[in-house]
UniProtKB/Swiss-Prot annotation:
Name of the protein this chain belongs to: Orotate phosphoribosyltransferase
Catalytic activity, EC: 2.4.2.10
GO BP terms, alphabetized: 'de novo' UMP biosynthetic process; pyrimidine nucleobase biosynthetic process
InterPro entries according to UniProt: OPRT (IPR023031), Orotate_PRibTrfase_bac (IPR006273), PRibTrfase_dom (IPR000836), PRTase-like (IPR029057)
Organism: Chlorobium phaeobacteroides (strain DSM 266 / SMG 266 / 2430)
Subunit structure comment from the entry: Homodimer.
Pfam families: Pribosyltran
Presence of keyword rRNA processing: no
Highest taxon of source: Bacteria
Keyword set, alphabetical order: Glycosyltransferase, Magnesium, Pyrimidine biosynthesis, Transferase
Length: 193
């Protein structure tokens, strides 16, 4: 699956949106990737996660972890394809935590899976949790890298679709200056002012 067919899948499923969006990172953009609309289809979910799993299959992964909520579906399927434990981290009181009886042991080889990387903030929070637990970060896999590889979180980072998509600090957003209404479809949209 190379990038043009992947873009076609995003378009055909209604997952590639155009307009004025507040991203989970807080930045603004005229393009939004709603990965859930792609990953809700088993054939797309399997194909996308197969690419990620194949990239990391020789790394000795013990566990896959994803930041909630966006990365959970891709993380679970990638873990299933690798045949390893799959967990997620979630926010409590504004901080990323590992809860619900999940745990990571010192020396455990962990792969972080996210749906979309823009600034890498959520993934970086998960990486810090893992480091504090003494885990070994094997790499980061994602469905979409909006930075086209400019945001580097680990030595081994893989994206199924990588392209540079412009984003703006809110105070520099030309769409705001034009008075265009903004939509905040991300998983933290209702948690941020």
């Amino acid at each position: 699956m190379n990038q043009p067919p992947m873009l076609d899948i995003f378009r055909s499923t209604g997952a590639l949106l155009e307009g004025h969006f507040k991203l989970t990172s807080g930045r603004h953009s005229n393009t939004y990737f709603q990965c859930a609309k792609v990953l809700q289809h088993p054939e797309h979910l399997s194909a996308v996660c197969h690419k990620i799993a194949a990239h990391f299959s020789q790394k000795g992964v013990d566990t896959v972890i994803s930041p909630a909520i966006g990365g959970i579906v891709a993380g679970t399927e990638t873990g299933r394809q690798l045949g390893v434990k799959t967990i997620f981290a979630e926010r409590k009181d504004g901080r990323m935590t590992i809860r619900r009886g999940f745990s990571v042991a010192p020396g455990e080889k962990v792969l972080v899976i996210e749906d979309v990387i823009t600034t890498g903030g959520s993934v970086q929070e998960v990486i810090e949790l893992l480091k504090n637990a003494g885990a070994l970060i094997i790499g980061v896999g994602c469905v979409v890298d909006r930075s086209n590889g400019k945001v580097r979180l680990t030595d081994d980072q893989y994206a199924v679709l990588s392209m540079e998509v412009v984003s703006y600090a809110p105070e520099e957003c030309p769409l705001c200056k034009e008075g265009m209404p903004i939509d905040a479809p991300g998983s933290r949209a209702n948690q941020q002012p």
